[in-house]
Each structure stands twice: as structure tokens, then as C-alpha cells.
């Protein structure tokens, strides 16, 4: 598909979304309004087919329109053709090698939510906010997120070619990453003076038990305070984030989910699952997502912990694959996770009560760092000095 035709598809799909969502303003009482908008959609489709300067690929137009609708509503949604959906189901249960990227759709293209610590992608220099213009020379502009994830998988030792855009770059940088088996980092614990430091870089099943074991070990070593480092905690089931919060929180609401057709479901802390009452500081960054930010939101809202760092990524939703008549499928967010005080974590993230810039200023008078949470980071993001200052601030933060 040439660039001019891509533009037509994108513009067309955006117009369709506007018509379907907002075309009924002023006549919303009419039950026929949505069908009127579909009539306009059909008319636009016929005009493209009849009048466009070149003979259009109508299948591409339709797929582009569907992707445009989904992206406008939910950047994490995907439309998969029947063949793509079969591949998706097969890939879900496979143990193929990977490059270790967590992806999301931002700015119309795929972007990096996180590079799993120790993965080939992290070693290749990927960081949160990198915009991926292409994967294996295929543009990600109209690529469903679920399909992009499939392209990352393959046989160990084979390469994936990326076109990556960063701040101050006018052309995509070509990066080749070799697939390997992904080993998710184990939970680690250490003493720093009288403070126990626990690092969690992912919440794969079993990690919460590891955290509980580290808490017990650190308390035996005389810990009077705990620091829970959730930077780059972006993988694993969301439910693990709820279980993680419950280790520190013995009462009250942890989170709840709610969707248009999903009834509100509350998750309360259970006293029997809490394992410590020590003062707590949690560190987060832009790569903290899913269960990590669910736990962070709960511990901050309940005043169980202070939160230090950057605003988290903002990806905490329940997604469901809906199969269509022709065997294709739509993957949609059907419910969002909310903080106990009612703030949606999805797209908003969790804002610390001590931001990174404050931590750096506390470490060195006159240090200047605007560090806007939603700016696209450049190659200097997440370098060791900034990370060290966050840890120093967490270690010295007075109890509330």
C-alpha cells in the first residue's frame, strides 16, 4: 500500500469513528441513529471505490478502517484476520524464543512499554517510549498490537529487524535483535543499613511468594523499614499485583474493575495474607505497568506506602478476544482497573507523591530535570545516576 493510499485509509477510518461515535449528537434519542451513521460509512466506501484516483484494494480499506476505529477507542485493541487469529492462539501457548519487548500502540505506531531486564532487547538499548516504525521492514502504522507481538517470537538465534525513532532523530535507526529464551528476573533482597530493599522486575506466577520470603528474611536480619523497587515491573498477570499489595495491606480495598458491560468487582485485602507492618516506600518508573502499577496505586491510596519516582505507564485493563463470523477476531479492553479512590489506572498511570525531579533535587541542590512523565524519552532515559538517586531518596525518606 503506497503512502498516499495509507493516508486515505487512515483519514477514512478516523472519519468513520467520528461518524459512529459522535454523529448522533442532538438526535441520540433516535434508536436508528447508529444505523444512519453506518449508511454514511457505506456511502463513503462506495465513493472511494468509484472515484479514488487509483483502483483501491477494498480489503485493505476495510481492514484499515477497522484498525482505525479500534485505535481511536483503545490503543491496545487489535483486529486479527482469521489467519492472524489462528497464529495468535498458537503463539499464546508456544514456548518460542523472543526479543523481550512489551509493546503498546502510541502515536499511531507501536512503541516500547518496557524492555524486560536482561533480555536481548534491553541489551540492544531499547527503552520505554521508543517508537517502533517498522518490524522486519513492515510498517507498524496499521499493525495490530497482538500481531506485532507475534512477530517478536521465533526460533532462538534468529533476528528481528526494527526501525526505531527517538527524540531528535529524523530517520528511523535500524536495530537488529537476536531472539533468545527469555529468563524473567527473580526477586532479590538485600539490606542497606536497617532498611530491607526488595527488587521486583516482573510479576510472573510465583514471584509474590518470593517477595513474601524476602520480607521474612529481611525482617530476620533486623530490617526496620522496607523499600519495594517496582521499576521495570511490567510483566505477569494483573492478579499478581493484587496479591503483591495484599502482602503489605491487611485491610481495605486494593482495587476494583469496571466496564460498560462488566459489573464492578472489588478486591479487598485479606488480613490473613498480609505478612508485614514495617514502614514501606515503593519506587516506580515509566516502565512500571499492569500488576506493578495496580499494587502501587493501592499502597499509595491506602497510605500504606510512599511512592517515589515517575508516573507509571498506564496499562491496567482486562482484555478479551471476541471471535467474529468469518473466523477473525477483535481483542478489546472490556474492563479497567481503578485505584481505591476511583481513579482509572489505564492510560493515566499512577503519579508518585515524590516525583523523580524532587528526588534528584534533594540529592543535589540546583539539579534541574523536568522529566515530564509523558515525554518520549531519548537515549539517556533510565541511566544509572537517576536510578541511584531514586533509591537514595527512598532510603532516606522519613516515615509519614
Outline where the language-model segments fall.
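PDZ/PDZ-like peptide-tail recognition elements
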Residues: 64, 75-114
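Short acidic, Pro/Gly- and aromatic-enriched capping/linker segments at domain boundaries
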Residues: 324-336
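Conserved functional hotspot residues or short segments at active or partner-binding sites
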Residues: 329, 341-400
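Cleft-lining beta-strand/loop regions that shape enzyme active-site pockets
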Residues: 25-37, 46-53, 57-58, 111-114, ...
Amino acid at each position: 500500500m503506497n503512502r498516499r493510499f495509507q493516508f486515505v485509509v487512515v483519514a477514512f477510518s478516523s472519519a468513520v469513528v467520528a461518524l459512529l461515535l459522535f454523529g448522533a449528537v442532538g438526535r441520540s434519542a433516535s434508536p436508528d441513529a447508529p444505523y444512519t451513521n453506518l449508511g454514511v460509512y457505506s456511502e463513503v466506501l462506495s465513493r472511494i471505490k468509484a472515484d479514488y484516483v487509483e483502483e483501491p484494494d477494498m480489503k485493505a480499506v476495510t481492514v484499515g478502517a477497522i484498525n482505525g476505529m479500534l485505535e481511536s477507542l483503545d490503543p491496545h485493541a487489535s483486529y486479527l484476520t482469521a489467519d492472524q487469529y489462528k497464529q495468535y492462539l498458537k503463539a499464546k501457548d508456544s514456548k518460542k524464543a523472543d526479543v523481550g519487548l512489551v509493546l503498546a500502540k502510541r502515536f499511531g505506531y507501536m512503541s516500547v512499554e518496557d524492555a524486560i531486564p536482561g533480555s536481548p532487547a534491553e541489551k540492544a538499548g531499547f527503552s520505554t517510549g521508543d517508537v517502533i516504525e517498522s518490524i522486519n521492514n513492515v510498517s507498524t502504522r496499521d499493525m495490530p498490537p497482538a500481531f506485532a507481538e507475534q512477530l517478536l517470537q521465533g526460533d532462538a538465534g534468529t533476528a528481528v529487524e526494527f526501525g526505531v525513532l527517538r527524540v531528535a532523530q529524523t530517520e528511523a535507526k535500524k536495530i537488529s535483535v537476536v531472539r533468545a529464551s527469555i529468563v524473567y528476573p527473580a526477586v532479590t533482597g538485600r539490606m542497606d543499613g536497617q532498611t530491607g530493599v526488595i527488587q521486583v522486575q516482573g510479576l510472573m506466577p510465583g514471584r509474590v511468594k518470593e517477595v513474601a520470603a524476602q520480607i521474612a528474611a529481611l525482617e530476620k536480619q533486623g530490617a526496620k523499614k522496607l523499600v519495594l523497587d517496582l521499576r521495570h515491573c511490567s510483566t505477569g498477570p494483573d492478579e499478581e499485583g493484587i496479591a503483591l499489595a495484599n502482602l503489605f495491606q491487611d485491610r481495605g480495598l486494593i482495587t476494583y474493575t469496571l466496564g460498560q458491560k462488566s459489573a464492578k468487582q472489588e478486591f479487598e485485602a485479606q488480613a490473613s495474607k498480609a505478612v508485614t507492618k514495617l514502614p514501606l516506600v515503593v519506587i516506580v518508573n515509566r516502565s512500571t505497568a499492569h500488576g506493578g502499577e495496580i499494587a502501587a496505586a493501592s499502597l499509595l491510596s491506602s497510605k500504606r506506602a510512599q511512592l517515589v519516582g515517575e508516573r507509571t505507564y498506564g496499562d491496567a485493563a482486562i482484555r478479551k478476544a471476541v471471535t467474529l463470523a468469518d473466523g477473525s477476531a477483535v481483542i478489546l479492553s472490556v474492563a479497567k482497573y481503578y485505584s481505591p479512590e476511583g481513579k482509572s489506572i489505564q492510560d493515566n498511570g499512577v503519579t508518585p507523591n515524590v516525583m523523580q525531579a524532587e528526588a534528584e533535587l534533594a540529592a543535589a541542590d540546583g539539579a534541574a530535570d523536568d522529566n515530564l512523565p509523558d515525554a518520549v524519552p531519548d537515549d539517556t532515559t533510565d541511566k544509572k545516576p537517576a536510578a541511584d538517586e531514586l533509591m537514595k531518596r527512598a532510603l532516606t525518606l522519613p516515615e509519614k
